[in-house]
Amino acid sequence: VKVLKVIGWSIFIIIAIIIAILAIMGYYYSKEDPNYVLDYIKEHKNEQTCSLMIRRNGEILATVNENKKLPLASMAKIVVAVEFAKQVSEEKINPQEQIPLQDLEKYYVPDTDAGAHPAWLENAKIRNAIKNEKLSLEEVARGMIHFSSNANTTYLLEKLGLERINNSLKELELNSHDAFYPYTSPLYMRGYVEKELNVPKDQSLEVLRKLSMDEYRKHALKIHEWMKDEAEWKKHNIPLKVDMEFQRIWSDRLVRATAKDYMSLIGKINNRTAFPKPMQDEIEKIFNGTVGDSIYEHAGKKGGSTPFVLTNSFYGTDKEGNKVEIVFMSNDLDSMESQKLKNNLDYFIRSVVTSEEFRKKL
């Protein structure tokens, strides 16, 4: 009986310790700590795995590794939204054109976007934006920005023209920006090299690592062409293999640019005079609601993430007319860093905007 009591107490103590550890971890992750972002930048800036730019009323308050090219993840979708607005303003596309959901679904890769595409569809249904299994082209663009749907982004790259979007990089003076390529087809790259290029399973990751960026893009475009045609895609039947080792390669191959590029772009959006008024109006229509704080006259943001990357671009003008732009980029994150940064980026941005005391720390 004594032995059973000892075992019982031991189990109780172990459970209590586990609960205490979980409670401490929960507090650590959820604790509002805008300083964490600054501390992270200070700790990792010499590794060149992060960058930060902050500008207020035209004055640069902070700049770290602003010329270092890093993976953008979904932050790159800002460029697609700007080109969308340009083509709307030039009447090259009709924002109210009705797009069949099926045209988007062919680019959707289940369980690879943290539920973004299904969440957008659910939201669109609630708002009665879907009629006869169709919705407007503008809704597709808003789904790309507000919900970060990769399927919508790939569709828009096709609709607007991949070459046209890549040409817009020069027009927007994004001088360090990599060329765009489809968002969803690269997810099939491991299955593709094993099935179509007959690479043994135990060698496929190494083959992917050794591909030049031009070769990688070329294969991604080939897969994309198959995905466009339902019959062709079924015929090839490429398996989806997205284990963490592959995701690291995929993440490293994402489109890259510098914080300086995106500071330039969001600055143009925030000053409201760099683009023709119809284009600016459409940009604001797409981004409206991405920042829900009433302290702003107008504001917008778009971030991106992978298991290793976290990025965010924010622009805002407060009710007193103060203009703030913030670009944060990071790579090589571990899971704890990623979660803590995600939890505190919005607090960090708000502190920069509202607190002179916090700005003195920059």
Could you say what each language-model-derived stretch is?
Residues 22-79, 83-190:
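Active-site-adjacent loops and short helices of periplasmic peptidoglycan-processing enzymes
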Residues 121-129, 195, 200, 308:
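Carbohydrate-binding/catalytic loop surfaces
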Residues 102, 212, 355-356:
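Helix N-terminus capping/helix-initiation residues
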Residues 110, 170-171, 182-183, 194-196, ...:
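Alpha-helix boundary/capping detector
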Residues 1-3:
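N-terminal secretory signal peptides that target proteins for export/translocation
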Residues 7-9, 52-59, 99, 106-112, ...:
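Short low-complexity stretches enriched in small and charged residues
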Residues 141-261, 265:
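Mid-domain, small-residue-enriched loop/turn segments at the edges of structured enzyme/sensor domains
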Residues 6-19, 25-38, 46, 61, ...:
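Structured C-terminal helix/loop/strand segments within mature extracytoplasmic catalytic/sensor domains
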